[in-house]
Amino acid sequence: MKDLLNLLKSQNQSKEFDAIRIGLASPDMIRSWSFGEVKKPETINYRTFKPERDGLFCAKIFGPIKDYECLCGKYKRLKHRGVICEKCGVEVALASVRRERMGHIELASPVAHIWFLKSLPSRIGLMLDMTLRDIERVLYFESFIVIDPGMTTLEKGQLLNDEQYYEALEEFGDEFDARMGAEAVKQLLEDIDLQAEVDALREEIPQTNSETKIKKFSKRLKILEAFLYSGNKPGDMVMTVLPVLPPDLRPLVPLDGGRFATSDLNDLYRRVINRNNRLKRLLELNAPDIIVRNEKRMLQEAVDALLDNGRRGRAITGTNKRPLKSLADMIKGKQGRFRQNLLGKRVDYSGRSVIVVGPYLRLHQCGLPKKMALELFKPFIFSKLEHRGLATTIKAAKKMVEREEGVVWDILDEVIREHPILLNRAPTLHRLGIQAFEPVLIEGKAIQLHPLVCAAYNADFDGDQMAVHVPLTLEAQLEARALMMSTNNVLSPANGEPIIVPSQDVVLGLYYMTRERHAALGEGMVFADVKEAHRAYGAGQVDLQAKVKVRVKEVAVDEDGNRTESFRIVDTTVGRALLYDIVPDGLPFEIVNKPMVKKAISNLINTCYRDAGLKDTVIFADQLMYMGYHYATRSGISIGFNDFEIPPEKYELVDAASDEVKDIENQYASGLLTQGEKYNKVIDIWSRANDKVSKAMMERLSKEQVIGPDGQPVKGEDGEDLMQESFNSVYMMADSGARGSAAQIRQLSGMRGLMAKPDGSIIETPITANFREGLNVLQYFISTHGARKGLADTALKTANSGYLTRRLVDVSQDLVVTEEDCGTDEGLLMTPHIEGGDVVVPLGDRVLGRVTARDVFTPTDKDNAVVPAGTLLDEKTVEMVERAGVDEIWVRSAITCETRHGICSKCYGRDLARGHQVNVGEAVGVIAAQSIGEPGTQLTMRTFHIGGAASRASAVDNIQVKHGGTVRLHNLKSIEKTDGSLVVVSRSSALAIADEQGREREWYKLPYGAVLSVKNGDQVEAGVVVAKWDPHTHPIIAEAKGTAKFVNMEEGITVRTQADELTGLSTMEVIDPKERPAAGKDIRPAIQLVDDSGEEVELPGGGTAIFFLPANALVTMANGAKIELGDVVARIPQESSKTRDITGGLPRVADLFEARRPKESAILAEISGVVSFGKETKGKKRLVITPKDDDAYEVLIPKHRQLNVFEGETVEKGEVISDGPSNPHDILRLLGVVELAKYITNEIQDVYRLQGVVINDKHIEVIVRQMLRKVEITDPGDTTLLSGDQVEITQVMEENEKANAADKEPARFERLLLGITKASLATESFISAASFQETTRVLTEGAVTGKRDYLRGLKENVVVGRLIPAGTGLAYHNERRRKRDLEEQGVTAADVEEALSAELNRES
């Protein structure tokens, strides 16, 4: 037995390797793999079921069918191992060699490999510089190609059809050589002199001017160099030998009834062999050319189908009309080799069952059914039984276990003790979807799960199933306990908030016990300590919610762990005192002295984790849960029909609304309103009515009369009935956050309100009934409409969200923390996140858990740093920074980290799931992908149509301050008018209001032409209007003073005058050039400023004060009017921007991560300079920007785009010229990486924030880092890179370092932004890319370039079956690398000498 095991071990001794290379197999290589040639298409003999000799299953070639037994049965058993039987020619070996031994087919004529021919760009085409159509014409025998023109007028590579060929033959005889088919292509490929071609192209590229040609050349140069450096031979793209897959990988299985189930590959191979044999025979017989040609073409098609069926022409189908699965189909797609067998394997020692709730379990436990445990731990039990001598053999032990003897259960108990098991619930969207627990044996067949981990698993008990896995090795058990135990996963990796938070019944119980009730039994009692209160409550002398005084003991723990106790008497309720009893030391009483709604409980656990540590938090969470369940049971809260109180005002409100709607219908009927206006008004009326009803309903629900202990209503001091917060069950459930919401209660006891159609538009007739009254048939049908769409959406959403997660994981999987500190001082500038003038996310929340990149200063004091650079900002530091009034902080970020492979611990900051600085080896890429992908299912799928209420919001025309404070003006350019007010003349100005601490509470953008009534540093009260502007026109402002002089303003030609009927004022409007008479087409009307003597006025910044007027501009002043500084010279009407659909939810997130260019994107200024307009073309305007000292830059802009800039203005690089959705590529090019990071982060956060999902910024930054891996070379300098190449940034850095070291010119480059799909496919590792998408393309490209995969990422290592280079696996990889470096150094003579002398000294 032992011998056999050793033999098996010796079989799979794999060599250690550090990289995998993919390349082209030469015919000799294929023959060297092969164990024999397959000559016949037969598979097995249908009578004897034995494989046919020389067939596709031949035992002589591929090995024996039974272990250690030849086919004829002459040699059996182990002792003949390795003997080759002389009768049947089969080697005696293990049958499993049939999985690894390959055969081959010698092809009678060469055949082009379809991947290199048809997968775009065609590699053969690039090498021969021919189009794919031409090559196909040669390959499929339609035309001849000249291989060697000899001394004739023909060219090498020229195509000739039959007639031309015969003409040429007559003319030149056999001077030249022209052939057709794959042999011609092979000959041409073999004739290429790679080095010469490369040199020629390298010389040619700098001499060409046309962009397209350079592109074409560099493509060809790339592939030629690839062949040159990888050592692949171009001729190998045309095969002469075809390898045959080992037979056990394409099995043939006899079914009952004499039929066979076979792999499609066998059919495809049979076709190839049949055609090949026929071709051989035809060639021997010297058959006519046309027949041979036809056979060769059929052979080519057969091999094509075998390699990649359906790639060319129609796919070959089997008997049942479905296309046969070719070799390419075997490896690609979800069912292919990569995703089905290499990245996702099924494992032994696992089971699954339904889950039920286990409320009495501790947090680290789960209930495991005895039956399952017995099955899962069987081998352990066998070994223990044998060890103890209770069973003599494994077989006896098996019997004992099957009989379930008493001793077996005792042993099971021992085996299971302290042996953690893993529980997994599909879908595993983030790492908390698999956690470790200690099993507790239970009766029954369902797994019991601790209620507090349900949130992490997203599990409920309506029939969910979970899988159990057993970690076998000691290391696995250790990791399960130290890293995966549910007690170690209290915080969510996505945002650092606790994820072990009570929900539903527990929240309800805790809320009920911490509410206060007026006039309850025992109100006003005083207790010496909590225990006394507990006794009184147990004796029924005081109510749980009674307001009492209790003396509590508070323990304060300072940072060094010193404890100080203090006692005080607090006003509280009995329930809160009881709750405080289980709170760990170090937390103040205030934290529980309020009704514990869900938010408060979450905050309590968070504070507990930060102040009392992990261990206490876990114990506390359990106690909290037990207590919550206990009091939820004691409360007796239940829902009755009467709890849904319908407010009596409802009916009046509904009637009033109906009357209003009738009026509007009448107005519409008499033609006073349009259809759209009527629709909007009706919907407005019903929304308002619905709001009023729900308000009345909530008021009614949330208040109730106080009833004393004697059952009588209690009167207040003024003699009125005393009211208190309601104890209505429905209200308590919603208020505590246990279940339900105001919106749901509204549907139950208010009115259901307006319903939506599937396309998102709102149906005019609302549902006035609620669920308590019941819906009539019409109402029921209206509500089914939207509900169905909801269900369909959910299904789609899940699939889309899963796909997004997969792409995210794929792009970020190889990002691991690899070093402590990369030493950069770059970072991102963090500011509070503003929306609509309000601070939505304060600065503190954004920088918590990050490392400062530069010293942090307050806005007032720029000398003394509040926090030095390189500090990890924890809760205490953040609080200090906020108190100091800091308004911006530079923090280190994943995007600016300079670590080569991976990222450094400092740039990442805090590990959110653990609360301390991140460890080296943490797979931050995958964590980021999971954190962004996991909430994906909560995002909406729809695009918001701006309609109804949203689109009629009045345009903003002023800034009204919400809080009092100090005015701060940011990058303001302004002109002071005569009355002292300021006029804004820059486009990127902003106004902020800071409070006493210096924190900016509000933040507003100031448009061009806004008039400010305050200056920088002024104090303002809340509610003051500080700025005004006209939202409908864009002003042109005089930056100098003088007299207006009209230029080219000719009535009826360039301008038209209109007089206002009411005021009598006349306005001049500039006519659009399209509508002008011929004489005025090219004239540009303008207003010039002149001084009193008629001389031109100079502008302060240089240049004359002349204002060109664009089309439709309005001028209200007369010629010769006096103009002061800051006056409005002319106004340009702004068409209200068309309402665009806002893409929201998941599609928006996907668009951002895929870096898609939006339609009609914003146009940004490419350089800084002065704006002017050039000659217009049809449908386009020509915008020219002229910088101070450089050439002008021109851009053509479609006429329908509205511009924000006007003639003669100065713009800064990257400023918006025409509004629209931002294009991330432009932001990166013009404003840089930091701005891009800010843009993508904010945009994605906006989508998630709308759904109430909190994700830390750094996860998004990690993904953005991966999207920015590639750069485009703009100038190669003296490096080996090519201009226009796209390469990894690390590669450029290494090249530049080499260049700098040799005092050569380094390469210059531009950062590129790739979408996540593209970035995944462009990774260094071909294994990772191939297992993601477009497998064929990735492998083809990899093979041609002879790519090496250094197995740096996680995915590649999973595929080759190694530990991943992250977490505990990183140590293994580092150790291997260290050993390898040592081996490379080898032993020097000095080392030997030293060792010898040491040895001699020791002996003496």
From Swiss-Prot:
Per UniProt, the enzyme's principal EC class comes to transferase
Q: What does the record list as GO biological process? A: DNA-templated transcription
Q: Give me the residues that bind Zn(2+) 1, please.
A: C70, C72, C85, C88
Cofactor: record remark: Binds 1 Mg(2+) ion per subunit.
Highest taxon above the source species: Bacteria
* Cellular component, GO annotation: DNA-directed RNA polymerase complex
Do you know which CDD domains this protein is assigned to? RNAP_beta'_C, RNAP_beta'_N
Enzyme nomenclature, EC number:
2.7.7.6
State the reactions this protein catalyses: RNA(n) + a ribonucleoside 5'-triphosphate = RNA(n+1) + diphosphate
Kindly list the cofactors needed.
Mg(2+); Zn(2+)
- What is a single molecular function from GO for this protein? zinc ion binding
One of the Pfam families matching this protein, by short name: RNA_pol_Rpb1_3
Cite the binding residues for Mg(2+). Answer: D460, D462, D464
Keywords assigned by UniProt, alphabetized: DNA-directed RNA polymerase, Magnesium, Metal-binding, Nucleotidyltransferase, Transcription, Transferase, Zinc
Where is Zn(2+) 2 annotated to bind? C822, C897, C904, C907
S-S bridge residues: none
Q: What does this protein do?
A: DNA-dependent RNA polymerase catalyzes the transcription of DNA into RNA using the four ribonucleoside triphosphates as substrates.
Q: Which family does it belong to?
A: Belongs to the RNA polymerase beta' chain family.
Subunit description: The RNAP catalytic core consists of 2 alpha, 1 beta, 1 beta' and 1 omega subunit. When a sigma factor is associated with the core the holoenzyme is formed, which can initiate transcription.
Put simply, this protein is called DNA-directed RNA polymerase subunit beta'
